[in-house]
């Protein structure tokens, strides 16, 4: 099974840290969302992951724009890092890929170090995140998706 994760990671690299671990342990390919163009061959991959930090309760626009191009029938999953992991921040992007006819196989979110706005004045929040347990959980999530996916 060939898996790709299309991602954008800003600020402190929280999402990249999660994606790097998943890529290493699940043999997934990583591609920055800004590098995906009209020549991207979706057929090269069985599973498509979308990963992003969360800004204003949604995935970064660059990742969402790529998701809007996914062909019908593809299996997808979502990974995100956020300041407060209190809801499914992948809900909006899931709807986008479902409307395109892709199959949503789940999402994984964890906290990330955050110094946005006034938080920088106090040194930020979630300084130790994503932590080792969260990285392991992300890997387990993707392994489970890969094991249960049926084309």
Regions flagged by a language model, labelled:
Residues 33-37:
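Conserved SAM/SAH-binding loop
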Residues 3-6, 10, 16-17, 24-31, ...:
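FMN-binding flavodoxin-like domain, especially the glycine-rich phosphate-binding loop
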């Amino acid at each position: 099974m060939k898996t790709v994760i299309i991602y954008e990671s800003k600020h402190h690299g929280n999402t990249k840290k999660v994606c790097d671990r998943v890529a290493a342990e699940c043999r997934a390919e990583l591609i920055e969302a800004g590098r995906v163009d009209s020549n991207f061959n979706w057929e090269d991959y069985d599973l498509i992951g979308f990963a992003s930090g969360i800004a204003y309760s949604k995935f970064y626009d660059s990742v969402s724009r790529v998701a809007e191009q996914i062909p019908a029938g593809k299996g997808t999953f979502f990974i995100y890092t956020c300041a407060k992991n209190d809801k499914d921040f992948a809900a909006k992007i899931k709807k986008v890929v479902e409307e395109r006819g892709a199959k949503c196989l789940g999402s994984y979110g964890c906290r990330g170090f955050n110094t946005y706005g006034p938080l920088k004045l106090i040194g930020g929040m979630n300084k130790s995140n994503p932590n080792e347990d969260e990285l392991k959980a992300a890997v387990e999530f993707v392994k489970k998706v890969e094991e249960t996916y049926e084309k």
